[in-house]
Amino acid sequence: MAKLTVEDLPLEGKKVLMRVDFNVPIKDGVVGDDNRIVAALPTIKYVIDHGGRAILFSHLGRIKKEEDKPGLSLRPVAERLSNLLNKPVTFVPVTEGKQLEDAIDNMKNGDVLLVQNTRYEDVKDGEYVKRESGNDPELGKYWASLGDVFVNDAFGTAHRKHASNVGIATNMPGKAAAGYLMEKEIKFLGDAVDNPERPFVAILGGAKVSDKIGVIDNLLDKADKIIIGGGMAYTFYAAKGIKVGNSLVEKDKIDVAKQILDKAGDKLVLPIDNVVADKFNNDADTKVVEGDIDNGWMALDIGPKSVEEFKNVLKDAKTVVWNGPMGVFEMPNFAKGTLEIGKFLGTLTDATTIVGGGDSTAAVKELGVADKLTHISTGGGASLTYLEGNELPGIAAISDK
């Protein structure tokens, strides 16, 4: 079902409530990586260029007690946003009440206002009440009453049912739309999963099989090949009876891995060789081994033959979805597999290439190939939920066309 988009809404003179994802790192009152703020700019600019009054909502971090609040104020974000837009941004240091309502009433067409961190609502009078993250119906209704229309551009929180995304949207039937970022995520991830150009290859990495079981299960029916790297590969090794030494293995998931292997046939591509280390440390002694891994050694990256094998599988692909690193990416000596795969994806100019997850995204940025890829997903958990084939509450609540 097609969803309303920001371009379908009347904006001139309207109070446009917008859920954005400004959950960015802040240190000493200064925003570190502002990628998520930059990603929201096209939708914000569209709204204000068309005479709308942009009222922005975002969460930042987790708030479980009063003492968490001062360090998680969105004030530094308002300052960075103001610089990026090259215009004033009104910051309102509260999430409800007269101060907020007056500030909204005083807005003119084209103005931008940022409401305090929505998760301030999770703690009231010292009590952890989760009004925002528990989708308190009264809070969603109240926030919805502050505007005329609603735009959700926060794909990163679409898998969560919060008052600031689902709550507002359900109280504005027929007036809740997707922003450009949300629209892009729905298009690329949706097409990749439901209507991919083939061959469709998924690359799944990261430490734990348990995090990706749902994704593997869903994609086995849809992908032509699934490449497995990272720590999760060694639970599959164990399921095949290959010795894994001291490598990471989820013993309680070996049976699940066996079932996946039986179902997958030759669809699943595992590493042929691995870079093993004598301890979990960047300065460990290392060697490359094929097959069994001896006791006292642990696999921390895929080996050169695996890299070549994975490239071989990828070279003819027309759709590629990559989520998760091939090794311990944060240690430079075990980042090579991840970087090699990232570099190779940048050469697949005829394919739709979609990257999600923190380490995979960091790798393509470090390599400078981000602009050669079709789409970099802004939502870690949200993109995994989407790849599992599950409905995302934040998207479901957006009005249908």
From Swiss-Prot:
Gene Ontology BP term (one): gluconeogenesis
UniProt EC number: 2.7.2.3
GO terms under cellular component: cytosol
Pfam family, one: PGK
Top-rank EC class of the record's enzyme: transferase
Reaction(s) this enzyme catalyzes, per UniProt: (2R)-3-phosphoglycerate + ATP = (2R)-3-phospho-glyceroyl phosphate + ADP
Binding site for substrate: D21, F22, N23, R36, H59, L60, G61, R62, R119, R160
Tree of life domain: Bacteria
InterPro entries: Phosphoglycerate_kinase, Phosphoglycerate_kinase_CS, Phosphoglycerate_kinase_N, Phosphoglycerate_kinase_sf
Quaternary state and interactors: Monomer.
Stated name of the protein: Phosphoglycerate kinase
Organism: Limosilactobacillus reuteri subsp. reuteri (strain JCM 1112)
Lineage: Bacteria, Bacillati, Bacillota, Bacilli, Lactobacillales
